[in-house]
Amino acid sequence: MNRDEVQLLGFEIVAYAGDARSKLLEALNAAKDSEFDKAEQLVEEANECIANAHKAQTNLLAQEAKGEDIAYSITMIHGQDHLMTTLLLKDLMKHLIELYKKGS
């Protein structure tokens, strides 16, 4: 996998993870306003974005597992960072939304 291909996967991960992050934060605002159905829908949409980011990540890992040399890319590192922080945010959102539900 050449550097351009790795960089493209990095951009793909950044885009999907960024969309998921935005949806999760929007879900938190919906829960804050007691719009729990909307919050749950947004979390589901975020999960789809995360799944797409994970597919791109898995593609890269599979290539490396096959013994293919993977070019170094700051964009890919940035994408991995975005994905991991979004996964952490998703875990926190579950708990925060539940707290809003208990408080209403």
From Swiss-Prot:
Phosphohistidine carried by residues: H78
Localization of this protein: Cytoplasm
PANTHER family reported for this sequence: PHOSPHOTRANSFERASE SYSTEM SUGAR-SPECIFIC EII COMPONENT (PTHR34382:SF9), PTS SYSTEM N,N'-DIACETYLCHITOBIOSE-SPECIFIC EIIA COMPONENT (PTHR34382)
Alphabetical list of InterPro entries matching this protein: PTS_IIA_lac/cel, PTS_IIA_lac/cel_sf
GO biological process terms held by the UniProt record: phosphoenolpyruvate-dependent sugar phosphotransferase system
Function recorded in the entry: The phosphoenolpyruvate-dependent sugar phosphotransferase system (sugar PTS), a major carbohydrate active transport system, catalyzes the phosphorylation of incoming sugar substrates concomitantly with their translocation across the cell membrane. The enzyme II LacEF PTS system is involved in lactose transport.
Name this protein carries in UniProt: PTS system lactose-specific EIIA component
Reported cofactor(s): Mg(2+)
Disulfide bonds: none
